[in-house]
């Protein structure tokens, strides 16, 4: 009952926020297009207002996704994909902390993680997790997304350990703890990521031991034909 009430409240908030955010965004575009040329100071102010408005619109969209997933009204796609290949492709395009000389790469088993899932949503979930972990690393280090297949209680799963390269195995062997979704600057992308992963029958957790400055572990069950 409480979960249903929370989902209804979130849905109402999304509806109430969406219209004013869209109106403000539209007026800002009109201001830039129709007004006399702005000086540098005013242009910067409008640019910052547009960025903030775009962030608010993105947050409303994330709230909508969370609300729909909680209410069970969003159907996750089911298509065959190799999760390890998806992780590899994502890792090649991640540059979240490149300015601090933090490198990111996929390692471990390159293929063989056949799952049935929603490719677009899984990509967004893993991208959010990667950004969160990279933000917490010290300068000049290498973070890896280590890919392996592991069996637990007779069920084989694709396991991805995201951690600084020297702490991967320790993170994998550590007791599981709750993954902190309340990291600043990432909006609702991490709560959304957890819901997407759990919607695929998987789990997202952090190592309980103090290994490195941040790590995340994801496990998704393989397709029955691949177990």
Labelled PLM ranges:
Residues 77-80, 103-113:
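Conserved catalytic submotifs in the C-terminal HATPase_c
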Residues 51-56:
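Short alpha-helical segment of the dimerization/phosphotransfer core of two-component systems
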Residues 23-38:
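Conserved C-terminal segment of the DHp
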Residues 155-187:
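Glycine-rich/acidic phosphate-handling loop/turn and adjacent ATP-lid/helix
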Residues 197-198:
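Detector for a conserved hydrophobic position within an alpha-helical segment of the HATPase_c
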């Amino acid at each position: 009952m409480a979960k249903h009430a929370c989902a209804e409240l979130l849905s109402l908030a999304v509806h109430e926020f969406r219209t004013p955010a869209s109106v403000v965004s539209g007026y800002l575009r009109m201001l830039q297009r129709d007004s006399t040329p702005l000086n540098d100071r005013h242009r910067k102010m409008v640019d910052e207002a547009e960025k903030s408005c775009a962030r608010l619109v993105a947050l409303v969209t994330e709230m909508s996704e969370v609300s729909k997933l909680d209410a069970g009204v969003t159907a996750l796609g089911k298509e065959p994909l190799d999760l390890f290949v998806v992780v590899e492709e994502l890792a090649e395009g991640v540059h979240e902390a490149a300015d601090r000389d933090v490198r990111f790469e996929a390692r471990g088993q390159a293929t063989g993680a056949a799952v049935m899932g929603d490719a677009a949503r899984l990509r967004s979930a893993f991208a959010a997790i990667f950004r969160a972990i990279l933000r917490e690393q010290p300068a000049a280090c290498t973070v890896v997304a280590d890919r392996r297949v592991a069996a637990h209680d007779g069920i084989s799963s694709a396991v991805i350990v995201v951690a600084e390269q020297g702490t991967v195995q320790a993170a994998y062997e550590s007791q599981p703890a709750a993954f902190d979704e309340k990291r600043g600057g990432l909006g609702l992308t991490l709560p959304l990521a957890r819901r997407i992963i759990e919607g695929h029958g998987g789990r997202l957790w952090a190592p309980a031991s103090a290994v490195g400055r941040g790590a995340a572990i994801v496990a998704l069950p393989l397709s029955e034909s691949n177990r």
